[in-house]
Design a protein with these regions (language model features):
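Accessory alpha-helical DNA-binding modules that contact the DNA backbone or grooves
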Residues: 2-201
Length: 201
């Protein structure tokens, strides 16, 4: 704090109690400095950023599907979950009526989506956008679980998540905070269902 820079006109900053976008409660996790929206994918801002991360070059890497297209498809109600991206072909006729979408561009987009139906487990885990899970941690989880099905079975909301947490912290380079975020993510029934839906696509 630079006390000498104070003028006397400073005011106390009140942290928001709710998200300015979706109005869900904004809470500050213990030990952190920032408040976070609890709205999840029900929050338009989180949905947009989450899907943008999902299709990014170092995640699913879907060519031709960037921030502009994601925002447009969300606004149209076509994409509300990651799995919806792989169902966007159902909207090809409606897409053809939009500005900037000719037959060739639609075919290229659908082809780019189709070839990414199978990716490495490491990329898949990273694409989920789990807090504190970057490429290195995603690689560790992929090596440990071996398959998406095994990972989902071990981290199901119906499983013993305390035991799953203990297994995670025993993995070299995964600490308690990261293990907490991983079990909290998969332990959320709504998020878990979205992942199961995604895998079926």
């Amino acid at each position: 704090v630079l006390s000498d820079a104070r003028t006397g006109s400073e005011t106390i900053f009140d942290y928001p109690e709710s998200c300015p976008v979706c109005h869900a409660a904004a809470t500050r996790p213990e030990g952190e400095a920032v408040r976070r929206c609890n709205g999840g994918l029900n929050c338009a801002a989180q949905l947009f950023e989450g899907l943008k991360h999902f299709v990014a070059r170092d995640a699913f890497d879907i060519e031709g599907l960037g921030a502009r297209q994601i925002e447009q498809f969300i606004d149209l109600g076509w994409v509300q979950t990651p799995a919806d991206i792989f169902r966007i072909g159902d909207k090809s006729a409606a897409m053809a009526e939009l500005d900037g979408y000719g037959d060739l561009s639609i075919k290229k987009l659908l082809s780019a989506i189709a070839v990414r139906r199978e990716i490495s487990l490491e990329r898949f885990i990273y694409a989920l956008g789990i807090r504190q899970v970057g490429h290195a941690t995603a690689r560790l989880l992929a090596l440990h679980y071996g398959s998406a099905e095994a990972m989902l079975a071990a981290l199901s909301p119906d499983s013993d998540l305390d035991a799953a947490y203990q297994v995670l912290v025993e993995i070299d380079q995964i600490g308690t905070a990261v293990a907490n975020d991983i079990t909290a993510f998969f332990g959320n029934p709504n998020l878990y269902r979205l992942i199961v839906d995604l895998i079926t696509e």
